[in-house]
A protein has these predicted regions:
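Residue-level detector of anion-binding/catalytic polar loops
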Residues: 2, 76, 154
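Short beta->alpha linker loops
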Residues: 58-62, 83, 140
C-alpha cells in the first residue's frame, strides 16, 4: 500500500532511529525480538509514527482510476500491509481510496504474520475463494515480492523510477499503476 497505492512517505531510517532500532534492521522483526516490556512501548511509538504518516497520505498517480478499472473488469482487490489495519484504513481514507476495499480485504499485521510471510495472501484467496494461479501480488519492495513468491501468485514489481532490484522474484514490472490494466489482462 505505502509506496504502491500511495506515494512513499515513510523514512524508515528515521523511524528506526526514533525507535532505537539498528540501521537496516526490519522494524517489525526487531520489535518481535525485544523483551516484552520494551516491545510494547516500541509498538505504541511505532503506531503513533505510522498514524501521523497515514493522515498525510497521497495517492499514486492513476491509483483511483486503475482500481476503478480493475474492479469494473471483475478483479478482486485487497491490501496486505505490514501496517496495523487501523493505520491502513487511515491511509486509504486520506488518499481517497477507501471505497475500493472492504474491511475484510485489508489485512495487516494484527491479523496475520507480516510479509514476507504469505499468510495474508492465503487469507485473501480464501475470502474470495480464488486460485493462486489467477492472482497477483503488486508491490514496491522485496517483502511484497517474497510474499507473492511464497504464496505462488504472480508478482508485480511497481517502481515509478524503474529501479527493479529483484528481477529473480518478479514476474511483471510496471512503472505506472495504469499499466496494471494491460499487464493483468
Amino acid at each position: 500500500m505505502d509506496g504502491t497505492l500511495t506515494l512513499a512517505a515513510h523514512n524508515f531510517d528515521d523511524i528506526r532511529q526514533a525507535l532505537q532500532i539498528d540501521a537496516g534492521t526490519p522494524i517489525l522483526e526487531a520489535i518481535a525480538a525485544m523483551p516484552p516490556s520494551r516491545a510494547d512501548a516500541t509498538r505504541r511509538h511505532l503506531h503513533a509514527i505510522e498514524m501521523e504518516i497515514a493522515h498525510q497520505s497521497k495517492p499514486q498517480p492513476d491509483a483511483a482510476t486503475t482500481l476503478a478499472s480493475l474492479q469494473q473488469r471483475g478483479f478482486k482487490l485487497g491490501i496486505l500491509t505490514r501496517n496495523a489495519e487501523d493505520i491502513a484504513a487511515a491511509t486509504l481514507s486520506a488518499a481517497g481510496l477507501s471505497q475500493f476495499f472492504t474491511k475484510e480485504e485489508v489485512i495487516g499485521r494484527d491479523s496475520c504474520a507480516p510479509k514476507p510471510d504469505p499468510e495474508g495472501i492465503f487469507q485473501l484467496l480464501s475470502h474470495w475463494q480464488a486460485d493462486a494461479t489467477q492472482s497477483a501480488m503488486v508491490g514496491d519492495y522485496l517483502f511484497d515480492l517474497d510474499a507473492g513468491r511464497n504464496a505462488n501468485v504472480t508478482t508485480v514489481h511497481f517502481s515509478p523510477e524503474g529501479d527493479f532490484l529483484w528481477p529473480e522474484k518478479t514476474d511483471v514490472t510496471i512503472r505506472s499503476l495504469s499499466e496494471l490494466t494491460d499487464q493483468l489482462g
